[in-house]
From Swiss-Prot:
InterPro entries assigned to the protein according to its UniProt record, in alphabetical order: Aminoacid_DH-like_N_sf (IPR046346), Malic_enzyme_CS (IPR015884), Malic_N_dom (IPR012301), Malic_N_dom_sf (IPR037062), Malic_NAD-bd (IPR012302), Malic_OxRdtase (IPR001891), NAD(P)-bd_dom_sf (IPR036291), NAD_malic_enz_proteobac (IPR023667)
Keyword check for Metal-binding: yes
E.C. number(s) listed in UniProt: 1.1.1.38
Protein name: NAD-dependent malic enzyme 1
Enzyme class, UniProt record, top EC level: oxidoreductase
Active site (catalytic residues): Y101, K172
Species this protein is from: Photobacterium profundum (strain SS9)
Residues with site note (Important for activity): D267
Cofactors, names only: Mg(2+); Mn(2+)
GO cellular component: cytosol
């Protein structure tokens, strides 16, 4: 037990204290605490340390065979004793991250109403739009500093899950704490229940959300704005992370609010930041620069285009012109390569097209330019998948890429595992062990010709906890593109492969708290440099990061009046 910090004064006692997850210690309450807080007789006689509690919890966890059962078990601990939950997860982060987040959280979102046990966070439904202020005041957390909000329309690669999407904000905020040290007392998951267009949810008698098709257009925009304005009044300094909004809303919401409040979209900006960081590490390992690469994307939605824009910004920072950088990026969607004369291009796609005059010089069978056509003609050195469609990185595509690139960089990033564009084993086999691979979901190391290849998980959890920690540490007022770029560079500096010439592209999850601290420092420094946070010395920034880094230790309690 960590008694270094001053005691907490608690206004609860008896069963109410045991039913408060942020404060409950279970069998770790001391003799004095049991007496002062009316807990005598409510707990077994033994007084245990958090280490003993964690060992028991892990033994129970190991008895479950199915990942979903493990997820439900961990969520139950989280809703009972949050300190124990985070100690358990931190002790087994590599094993448990896939359980509390991707890929298992996807299935948990699909089955949310059926596995529901206890409310967590806020469910803000459209029929109650006139009472958003009251709902925020009802939150169990009063000093909220980080909000993750979704409307449940684009959950991972699984589509519209309605309020089932709440599993994502809950999981993301668990990682803010486990990876980034942000106190769970400062976090709030929110789902905006605007209905669902998923017929399975609407017809499911167990579905707990608003049983209505989704609102859209001005009604939707007004509802989201009412929520944002209410948050600004209740918690004016809170960081808001937009999560898993559909393509048609994700970019417009980000553009509308990024210069008005402290916010970012993790699917667009967080994914871009971790991908750029991984690419910088891969380029260093391949003894090249990002500005020298030719990059092909499969998937030209808001996430793919967000990554592309971040890559272009980094390439320009390395000394090439923006026009040159854009000419080296090839966006492929379901209709083929994006070309400037194509109809119905989305606003955020228009700056990422190739010129028809350029494509006319290619050797093509017809005007529909496929990914394989891009491989044969543009000869990309980097291939990034954000399509959500499994198997599209075929053997022909990967072998064609390897034919002109000795060390191809291949990132099949779609989540969950069932949606990945190609498995790492196939990519490594098809390139005879030469590909540099990172994936969006966790994969076991690949053995090829007697050599073991660890697979980096290019997961946003390497980025967003550190961004949040840096913002909180220096009270940054905005999240800028430059702050995100700083996070990418800091992540790249942690790459074992880039540093040592062997190992994975990204550091092991066991080091993720160190990585988050490094990213937090880089983000905080950039925020100060840009005038988005009060001035602080480097030493003071580090002190503030330490002061904000929550530890999963029990505090001593003192009784206050109640």
């Amino acid at each position: 037990m960590n008694n270094d910090k001053r005691p907490l004064y608690i206004p609860y006692a008896g069963p109410a204290l045991l039913e408060t997850p942020l404060l409950n210690k279970g069998s770790a309450f001391s003799i004095e605490e049991r007496m002062f807080f009316n807990l005598e007789g409510l707990l077994p006689e033994a007084i245990e340390s958090i280490e003993e509690q964690t060992e028991r919890a892990y033994q129970q966890y190991q008895k479950f065979d199915k990942d979903m059962d493990k997820h439900i078990y961990l969520r139950n601990i989280q809703d009972t004793n949050e300190t124990l939950f985070y100690r358990l997860v931190e002790n087994h982060i590599t094993e448990m991250m896939p359980i509390i987040y991707t890929p298992t959280v996807g299935a948990a979102c699909e089955d949310f109403s059926n596995i529901y046990r206890r409310g967590r966070g806020l469910f803000i439904s459209y029929p109650n739009r006139d009472r958003i202020e009251d709902m925020l005041n009802n939150a169990s957390r009063q000093n909220v500093k980080v909000i993750v909000v979704t409307d449940g329309e684009r959950i991972l690669g699984l589509g519209d899950q309605g309020i089932g999407g709440m599993g994502i904000p809950i999981g993301k905020l668990a990682l803010y704490t486990a990876c980034g040290g942000i106190s769970p007392a400062y976090t709030l998951p929110v789902v905006l229940d605007v209905g669902t267009n998923n017929p399975q949810r609407l017809s499911d008698p167990m579905y707990m959300g608003w049983r209505h098709t989704r609102i859209s257009g001005q009604e939707y925009d007004n509802f989201v704005d009412e929520f944002i304005q209410a948050v600004k009044r209740r918690w004016p300094d809170a960081l808001i992370q937009f999560e898993d909004f559909a393509q048609k809303n994700a970019m417009p919401l980000l553009e509308r609010y990024k210069n008005k409040i402290c916010c970012f979209n993790d699917d667009i900006q967080g994914t871009a930041a971790v991908t750029v960081g991984s690419l910088l590490a891969a380029c260093k390992a391949a003894k090249s620069k990002l500005s020298e690469q030719r990059i092909s994307f499969l998937g030209a939605g808001s996430a793919g285009c967000g990554i592309a824009e971040a890559i272009i910004a980094q390439m320009v920072s390395e000394g090439i012109s923006e026009a040159q950088a854009r000419s080296q990026v090839f966006m492929v969607d379901r209709w083929g390569l994006l070309i400037d004369d194509m109809p119905n291009l989305l606003n955020f796609q228009q700056a990422l097209v190739q010129k028809r005059d350029t494509v006319n010089e290619w050797d093509l069978a017809d005007n529909n330019v496929s990914l394989l056509d891009v491989m044969r003609n543009a000869k990309p050195t980097v291939l990034i998948g954000v399509s959500g469609v499994p198997g599209l990185f075929s053997e022909d595509v990967i072998r064609e890429m390897h034919a002109h690139c000795k060390r191809p960089i291949v990132f099949p990033l779609s989540n969950p595992t069932s949606r990945v564009e190609a498995t790492p084993a196939d990519i490594i086999n098809w390139t005879d062990g030469n590909a540099l691979v990172a994936t969006g979901s966790p994969f076991e190391p690949v053995v090829h010709n007697g050599k073991t290849y660890p697979i980096a998980q290019c997961n946003n959890s390497y980025i967003f906890p550190g961004i949040g920690l840096g913002i909180l540490a220096v009270n940054a007022r905005r999240v800028t593109d430059e702050m995100l770029m700083a996070s990418s560079r800091a992540l790249a500096e942690c790459s074992p492969l880039a540093i040592n010439g062997h190992g994975a592209l990204l550091p092991p999850l066991e080091d993720i708290q160190k990585v988050s601290r490094k990213i937090a420092f880089a983000v905080a420094k950039k925020a100060i440099e840009q005038g988005k946070a009060p001035k602080n010395s480097d030493e003071r920034i580090l002190d503030k990061i330490d002061a904000n880094f929550w530890q999963s230790d029990y505090r001593n309690y003192k009784r206050t009046s109640f």
